[in-house]
């Protein structure tokens, strides 16, 4: 099913919400079809990552003779088809993993030939874990190993966060980003809903990791704490009281509780009449 394997947990849940990226699966076309268009993680670049998906479409002959040449051909063709997109994620599948295709080497070869592109390799074939949760872990760790720390961001606030484990399902992220902005907080990156590839390379410069979905993204938060000393703060942005509590926790961390409380009071006054209607 669409929620079945470690490959799915890496690509479908966490990888594909990144908006400015060509997402290509190295394997049979069925793997790609199974992880396309069943989640509504919209983006502000006309939903590029939802409209297009890519597969190397491995066949039986590639299992016998190898598919590295096929992969390189597909990578170059994809960049040529979308010249404005300079970032790519390649996802390993069971088929390409079992025959030992060296995806990392091919990715590096292309980056050497096309110096303006950058490629992330996610080695999380379907058999790599007992369920899709195994893929969550693998892509979390692969991202921090390969990409975090390779871009230096512009810091514009005294309060800087990564918003982690939020996938912008039908635009729900926009509500929280509005609250953060009103509190004077700079959101350095969103992992990974409506997230920008290069912004996510700069996660190491945040002051705090604000974590929404621990089940899918606590791994990168824990590693950011170990490697860069960035604290982790778990929140719940769904529900009136949980959201209020979450804003207070963030405000307390930065010493701006008054800003959080002002937003809570303003939004309570705005929505309380409608909530009271349901209680009648």
Swiss-Prot record:
UniProt key word Ribosomal protein: no
Function: This iron-iron protein is part of the nitrogenase complex that catalyzes the key enzymatic reactions in nitrogen fixation. Other nitrogenase complexes utilize a molybdenum-iron protein or a vanadium-iron protein.
Organism of this sequence: Heliomicrobium gestii
Cofactor: [8Fe-7S] cluster; [8Fe-9S-C-homocitryl] cluster
Cofactor note: Binds 1 [8Fe-7S] cluster per heterodimer. Binds 1 [8Fe-9S-C-homocitryl] cluster per subunit.
GO biological process, one term: nitrogen fixation
EC number: 1.18.6.1
Signal peptide limits: none
The keyword Iron appears for this protein: yes
Reaction(s) this enzyme catalyzes, per UniProt: N2 + 8 reduced [2Fe-2S]-[ferredoxin] + 16 ATP + 16 H2O = H2 + 8 oxidized [2Fe-2S]-[ferredoxin] + 2 NH4(+) + 16 ADP + 16 phosphate + 6 H(+)
Coiled coil: none
Protein name: Nitrogenase iron-iron protein alpha chain
Other comment: The structure of the 8Fe-9S-C-homocitryl cluster is assumed to be analogous to the 7Fe-Mo-9S-C-homocitryl cluster.
UniProt-annotated binding residues for [8Fe-9S-C-homocitryl] cluster: 213
Subunit annotation: Hexamer of two alpha, two beta, and two delta chains.
């Amino acid at each position: 099913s669409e929620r079945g394997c470690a490959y799915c947990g890496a690509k479908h849940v966490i990888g594909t919400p990144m908006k400015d990226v060509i997402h290509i699966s190295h394997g049979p076309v069925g793997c790609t079809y199974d992880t396309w268009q069943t989640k509504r993680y919209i983006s502000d670049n006309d939903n590029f990552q939802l409209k297009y998906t890519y597969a190397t479409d491995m066949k039986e002959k590639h299992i016998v003779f190898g598919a590295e040449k096929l992969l390189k051909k597909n990578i170059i063709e994809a960049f040529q088809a979308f010249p404005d997109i300079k970032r790519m994620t390649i996802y390993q599948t069971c088929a390409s993993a079992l025959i030992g295709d060296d995806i990392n080497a091919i990715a590096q070869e292309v980056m050497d030939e096309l110096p303006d592109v950058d490629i992330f390799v996610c080695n999380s074939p379907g058999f790599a874990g007992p369920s899709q949760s195994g893929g969550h872990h693998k892509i979390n760790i692969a991202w921090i190993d390969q990409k975090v720390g390779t871009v230096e961001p512009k810091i514009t606030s005294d309060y800087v966060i990564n918003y982690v484990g939020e996938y912008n399902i039908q635009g729900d992220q926009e509500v929280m980003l509005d609250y953060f902005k009103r509190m004077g907080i700079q959101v350095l990156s969103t992992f990974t809903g409506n997230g920008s590839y290069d912004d996510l390379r700069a996660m190491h410069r945040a002051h705090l990791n604000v974590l929404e979905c621990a089940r899918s993204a606590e791994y990168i938060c824990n590693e950011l704490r170990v490697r860069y000393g960035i604290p982790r703060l778990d929140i719940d942005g769904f529900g009136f009281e949980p959201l209020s509590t979450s804003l207070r926790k963030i405000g307390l961390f930065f010493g701006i509780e008054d800003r959080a409380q002002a937003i809570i009071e303003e939004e309570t006054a705005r929505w309380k009449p409608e909530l009271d209607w349901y209680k009648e």
